[in-house]
Amino acid sequence: MVHGPPPDRRWGQWVRLALGPASALGLARFAYGLLVPAMRTELHWSLAQAGTLTTANSLGYLLGAVAAAPVARLLGVAVTFRLGMVLTAAALAVNAATGRGYAALLVIRLVAGLAGALVFITAGVIASRAAARARSAAPLTICFAGAGLGIAISGTVLPPLLGHHPGRWPLGWGVLAAAAGLATIISWTAAEGGRERGTAGAVIHLRSVALLWPVALAYLLFATGYVAYITFLSAYLADHHAGVGQVALTWALLGLAAVAAPALWSRPISAWRGARALAALLAGLSAASALALVTTAPAAVAGSAIGYGVTFLGVPAAITALNRAAVAPRDWTGTLAAFTVVFAAGQTAGPYLAGALADRYGTGATLAWTAALCGAGAVISAAIRPPASASLGQD
């Protein structure tokens, strides 16, 4: 009889693995929103220019998602995870040293997105294998909660650091790089469950996207909309003269809510029929974004951040569950790959479009953008009928 590691050791491994999403998403992607006000002021950017850096990061994520399978086949899942962690920390460090060169910043944000995709995808593979061995969803829940941890840490540290000193933005990137480097060291052995090489890459099933077009459209609207809120939230608060304490508390609450989200939504996503969970998540996102538009009173902004944090990471999980229910098992991976392309396309276009809109109508337009697109996605999702069977991929 083969025995796995002791329970305490397994939990320790799962927590350390969660530092992958914490670094790849929380630090390297979403924390940029905290730096936008300082960089915009110091570098005299338009909001469209600020949004384009998120667009570059999202494009890098798409490239990384495409590259993850062949790289994992070549190097192994564990090595790919570690490589992604090192590249993520390095990209953040180079961000700190680049200076004012806009083109260089775009390239580095693209590299950070690519590295982040390698980390997030391989962490998911390792966590999935751990979940199968443990016969528990805990490894997956803990792993994906890591993104919220990275957001909470960033939100606690960066606002006091930058404060009324926008010229410190390179130091902000340096702090994120140091945190990502520490996460790399701590998580290094957490990839032990991913030594084996990956299996053959999946064929992207565009046919499934066509047959599941209402789900794909809702996902596209979410991807195009959600990213505007977290990219421009700090800029919106700065324009409304929010204090450092309010900004820090807002981001900390958003991150902690995101940590709790996987455990909160796992049962509804698996138990509710059809797209009810997806509709509820998107409706919650829309309402949370709109709340901060009504008033910038601290209580309302805090409620908005909590509502956003507790919903936005649940949408990809709900999409995954819908796809698994609608297509044959042999087509799961290819269908999810196709939906990843849909998601990446939306979140690549969204930040620039929302930023350009905000340049004309003010930073509040970015929150309205999120509320409108996610609200439209909720309406579409509410009309989706439950699949009769997992038959799309069958002859």
Regions found by a protein language model. Name each.
Residues 32-33, 211-252, 259:
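Extracytoplasmic gate region of multi-pass secondary transporters
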Residues 63-99:
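Conserved MFS/SLC helix-loop-helix module at the cytosolic interface between two early adjacent transmembrane helices
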Residues 64-77, 261-273, 358-359:
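Helix-to-loop junctions at the C-terminal end of transmembrane segments
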Residues 79-93, 276-291, 371:
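Structural signature of the two symmetry-related core transmembrane helices
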Residues 101-104, 133-192:
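Helix-loop-helix hairpin linking two adjacent transmembrane segments in secondary transporters
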Residues 108-147:
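Cytoplasmic helix-loop-helix junction between adjacent transmembrane helices
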Residues 275-319:
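C-terminal transmembrane helical hairpin of 12-TM major facilitator-type secondary transporters
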Residues 327-363, 367-370:
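A late C-terminal transmembrane helix in Major Facilitator Superfamily
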